[in-house]
A protein has these predicted regions:
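Glycine/Thr-rich phosphate-binding loops that ligate phosphate moieties of nucleotide
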Residues: 1-140
Length: 140
């Protein structure tokens, strides 16, 4: 939503909300944004994406990864190596100069999250997310 004029907001809070609700909202928004990006990638490339491999600090959060799996309706895989981006760059460099082959490369899976909720449940939540984005975009 590359909209520089759009301001961040948290919608739907009640007087019963606490810091845990704020944290959950932040984590859910990360998953929704990932879905937006993956949907755009699928549309542009016409390639089906069947699983998501994650790394980095946020990948340590089980709630986030389960929510992503439910939202995307696909497995989300976390590996033992937390910084796969750097490792991937090293792998590509080694492959390009012939230091190793594809068969020699391997990364150990730590945990796989599979969808636990139905696409119907998650589609409703995603629809609400899209409404929230439009609301934020209209407030300038």
């Amino acid at each position: 939503y590359w909209d520089d004029a759009c301001q961040a907001s948290i919608l739907g809070l009640t007087f019963g909300a606490n810091k845990n609700h704020i944290v959950r909202a932040a984590l859910e928004s990360m998953a929704y944004q990932s879905k937006d990006v993956l949907d755009a990638m699928k549309q542009d490339s016409q390639i089906n994406i069947s699983s998501l491999k994650v790394d980095g600090g946020a990948a340590a959060n089980d709630f986030l990864l389960q929510f992503q799996s439910d939202l995307l309706q696909m497995p989300v895989q976390r590996f033992k190596t937390n910084e796969l981006t750097a490792l991937g760059a090293a792998y590509l460099a080694g492959l390009s100069c012939g230091y190793w082959t594809h068969e020699e490369l391997g990364v150990d899976l730590q945990k796989e999250f599979v969808p636990e909720k139905t696409s119907k449940e998650m589609d409703q939540l995603y629809s609400n997310w899209k409404k929230a984005v439009k609301t934020c975009q209209s407030y300038k």
